[in-house]
């Protein structure tokens, strides 16, 4: 004879934890800031949450969430004043068990100020882009000439420098009689 004791087997199914959570872009577009988040589609993500800090990362507030997102996901933040203030962003995802997992890196908007007291010389100054995992290698200064709607690179600036002077006289076009 043989006997078996009472046995019960439990199997728990856990959703995968996203392995990729990256805030790829924080762009100022006129009076709006566009924040782009790269996540993993099909990794059990139920919700995405966007957080913003307007006090240099001391505290973050939930500003947007979306259910069943598809990635890449871009959120447009209209509650900003990008001409006078820099903001920091972070994104998280919620799994099917309502756990907040997969926190992203922190992205920062760049506040650019222009001293245009001189008609021809323009002085640009900006805040450092902070909290990038490997730091900033360099900044690229782009200019837009009214005759050409696309931006063109006018300088590469070392990452420790947050100031650039440019003589826009080279962009002034003299009319001619043809």
Regions found by a protein language model. Name each.
Residues 2-44, 82-83, 95-135, 171-176:
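Pro/Thr/Ser/Gly-rich low-complexity, intrinsically disordered linker/stalk tracts
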Residues 47-84, 137-177:
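Recognizes extended acidic, P/S/T-rich segments that occur
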């Amino acid at each position: 004879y043989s006997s078996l004791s009472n046995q019960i087997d439990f199997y728990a199914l856990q959703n995968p934890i996203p392995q990729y959570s990256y805030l790829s872009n924080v762009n100022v577009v006129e009076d709006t800031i566009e924040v782009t988040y790269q996540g993993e589609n099909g990794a059990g993500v139920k919700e995405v949450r966007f957080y913003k800090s307007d006090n240099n990362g001391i505290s973050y507030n939930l500003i947007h969430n979306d259910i069943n997102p598809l990635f890449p996901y871009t959120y447009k933040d209209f509650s900003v004043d990008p001409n006078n203030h820099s903001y920091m962003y972070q994104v998280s995802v919620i799994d099917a068990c309502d756990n907040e997992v997969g926190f992203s890196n922190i992205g920062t908007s760049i506040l650019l100020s222009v001293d245009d007291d001189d008609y021809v010389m323009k002085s640009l100054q900006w805040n450092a882009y902070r909290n990038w995992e490997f730091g900033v290698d360099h900044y690229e200064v782009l200019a837009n000439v009214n005759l050409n709607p696309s931006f063109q690179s006018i300088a590469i600036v070392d990452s420790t420098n947050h100031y650039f002077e440019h003589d826009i006289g080279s962009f002034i076009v003299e009319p001619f009689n043809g």
